[in-house]
Amino acid sequence: DDALNHAASIEEYQKLPLVLFGHSWGGYAVGNVLNMRSDIKSAVIVAGFNKSEDLLEYQGELMAGKGAKIFTPYMALYERIKFGKKYTAISAIEGLAKTDAGIMIVHSKDDTTVPIRYGYDKFYKEFGSSDRFEFVLYEDKGHDYLFYSEAAWAYREQLNKDYKSYVEDNGRNYCAEVKEEFMNKYLDKKQCFEPDPILMERILKMFDTYCVK
């Protein structure tokens, strides 16, 4: 909210419509900031989730087992004390219900960082029949590379194979220094992070539709 207020204070941005795009914790932030803003025209939530305590509980279980669940109320209390009720007593679902913005939800079924039960499934259950919402669910794009092209995926797979050969054929060890050396020599960032043109076109079309309303 503070970041948006800052942007709105800059004269050259004041006549522009506000649209949001967030991934993971950024997706959580996008959904929740809608509780505080009525001027957002459109928003995209990629691999996001509904409430922070859900993800804290999930990550706690991964690290410490089911017993971590008993600490969830204390973690929620810590968040409430540190960040205040304004930011912790809300959810993305509540924010999405308060806005008239066009919304796109993007997730992948195999996401193990933010499983779809904490985000996509909840959002679809609440808003699946709404014309304001577009839902994009992939099968196998994981968490970090949801919005990259098929060519980028293929390039990344080949890059990983080349890195393995670089290490083993030269008698090197797998370590951060060797990987950095390899990437500095061979990584083509434009190819590796090329966005998915089909998804980008859908996002731009939604932004255009809601920004002229």
Where are these regions (language model features)?
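Active-site nucleophile elbow and catalytic-triad environment of alpha/beta-hydrolase enzymes
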Residues: 79-95, 101
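Alpha/beta-hydrolase fold nucleophile elbow
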Residues: 12-24
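C-terminal catalytic histidine-bearing segment of alpha/beta-hydrolase fold enzymes
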Residues: 130-213
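Short alpha-helix in the alpha/beta-hydrolase fold that links the catalytic acid
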Residues: 101, 115-125
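Acidic catalytic loop of the alpha/beta-hydrolase fold
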Residues: 110-114, 143-145
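Hydrolase active-site cap/lid region
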Residues: 32-85
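Alpha/beta-hydrolase active-site loop
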Residues: 1-11
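Short beta-strand/loop motif that positions the catalytic acidic residue
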Residues: 99, 105-107, 111
